[in-house]
Curated annotation (Swiss-Prot):
Key words, A-Z: Cell inner membrane, Cell membrane, Cell shape, Cell wall biogenesis/degradation, Glycosyltransferase, Membrane, Peptidoglycan synthesis, Transferase, Transmembrane, Transmembrane helix
GO cellular component: peptidoglycan-based cell wall; plasma membrane
Gene3D superfamilies named among the record's database cross-references: Biosynthetic peptidoglycan transglycosylase-like
Family from the record: Belongs to the glycosyltransferase 51 family.
Gene Ontology biological-process entries: cell wall organization; peptidoglycan biosynthetic process; regulation of cell shape
Protein name (database record): Biosynthetic peptidoglycan transglycosylase
Gene, per the UniProt record: mtgA
Molecular-function annotations in GO: pentosyltransferase activity; peptidoglycan glycosyltransferase activity
The enzyme's E.C. designation: 2.4.99.28
SUPFAM superfamilies, per the entry: Lysozyme-like (SSF53955)
The organism of origin for this protein: Rhizobium johnstonii (strain DSM 114642 / LMG 32736 / 3841)
Length: 245
């Protein structure tokens, strides 16, 4: 009479063992996902330290693929103010006034998307910085959902000066060219501190597509766009007070 229960227990043991093993694997997966999601927020706090020079995911990719890259970190004090003016007027005119996300612009972007219309970029400098530091290129709702809270946190934790300094030192300005110092030397053979207003505007308008837009050898369309940004930058005094006041 006792044989059947013993056989049943012996049959159940492998199933129980597999269940516990599967549960351990699931726990490890959940833990790994949580670490991946939380780590960027810890790094943002770490980047408060002025002597820390962050690298972007694209720079890490180039290292993994053994391509190498050129990036020479410079402080904001060693970057010509015309660069900041031009980049802000080209990429994020409301940089000093929003909290990481320009919600009015984002709302219009969503409305255009729902209507099936061609959309503008809509990414602020904090959003671009968060993407460059922690995420991947390419448009997707998943990336945008991860990018928004990272941008808000980045803008909240870091000062506007520190955030701009990081952005200008990790932005891509050509294949394997990262940061404003490497870009200035590569395209114009001068340090970032010596860039002219025209050169700064050319670098600024190449940011959305640095592989195809060559600031050092601009086409007619790029020169025309740079002229627009150059004029805006000349009247940008009220827009850059969070950086230089």
């Amino acid at each position: 009479m006792d044989i059947a229960p013993e056989r049943e227990d012996s049959v159940d043991m492998p199933a129980r063992r597999r269940w516990f093993e599967d549960r351990r694997v699931l726990k490890r997966i959940v833990l790994a996902v949580l670490i991946v999601l939380i780590l960027p927020y810890a790094l943002i706090v770490f980047y408060l330290l002025p002597f820390i020079h962050p690298v972007s995911t694209l720079m890490l990719r180039d290292l993994v693929l053994l391509r190498g890259y050129d990036r020479q970190w410079v402080s904001l004090d060693n970057i010509a103010p015309v660069v900041v003016q031009s980049v802000m007027m080209s990429e994020d005119g409301q940089y000093c006034f929003h909290g990481g996300v320009d919600w009015a612009e984002m709302r219009m972007l969503v409305e255009d998307t729902l209507k099936g219309q061609a959309t503008r970029g809509g990414s602020t400098i904090p959003m671009q910085t968060a993407k460059n530091l922690f995420l991947w290129n390419g448009r997707s709702f998943v990336r945008k959902a991860l990018e928004l809270p990272l941008a808000v946190t980045t803008d909240f934790v870091l000062s506007k000066r520190r955030l701009m300094e990081i952005y200008l030192n990790i932005a891509e300005w050509g294949p394997g060219i990262y940061g404003i110092e490497a870009a200035a030397r590569h395209h114009f053979k001068v340090p970032a501190s010596k860039l002219t207003r025209r050169q700064a505007s050319l670098l600024a308008v190449s940011l959305p597509n640095p592989i195809d837009r060559n600031a050092g050898k601009p086409g007619r369309g790029l020169r025309r766009l740079a002229g627009v940004i150059e004029r805006r930058a000349q009247g940008s005094g009220d827009y850059i007070k969070c950086i230089y006041d």
